[in-house]
Amino acid sequence: MKLTAPSSFFALAVFLAVGSTSLEQSTASPAPLKTLPYMFTLAALNTTLPNANDTGVPLVLGHEFSLPGSTLLITSTYASWPYKEYYNISLGLVGGAMHGYDTASAWFNASLVVSGHAMTWLGSYLSSPETDQFTAVHAARGHRYASLAAHGQDALWSLCPTGNKDGKNEVFYNISSENSHSSVVVKDCYKVTLKIIPVPH
């Protein structure tokens, strides 16, 4: 269900660190990056309506269900997640794969991002697959933070109310009326970009 984060990840982070904590401060090529030298969280910035700030609403990884030896987490807004003590998780991007680390340094891997489905995470005693699918896109002019892309696209994310008993607003990828989850009403979704917010040391 949980895997211990290898020290090599942190060694890599130190090796790659260049004194900057956000991509907008980098003087390197603006090409998307598959590895970041810092831990971060995600926030969803509405791209269709004005926002109260330049980061958007904070996102969390919440427990969806467990099976023997494994746990599934799902990405939703902090405000809609009913269990506020659950999960204090920081994220890492290494080689195009996303990892979530809890306060005990156990980790979860982001599952394959599929059109019409929510952004999920898996932890397993048997190890969970790492999927090379994510990149960090440099902050656009006028924005402070980089954005997260999947399969090279950072404009296909949406926040959708699921309509389930908990009433969570979850992150979906490239959702449409043709491929939506049965509990999601697509017209109630709105487009967002996922902002990468560095975690202070």
Task: Describe these PLM feature segments.
Residues 62-116:
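Short, well-structured hydrophobic secondary-structure segments
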Residues 25-64, 116-201:
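Extracellular glycan/ECM-engagement signal in secreted proteins
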Residues 1, 7-8, 13, 38, ...:
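Short non-domain terminal segments
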Residues 1-30:
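Fungal secretory targeting signals
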Residues 14-15, 20, 92, 139, ...:
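Short linear sequence elements within intrinsically disordered, low-complexity coil regions
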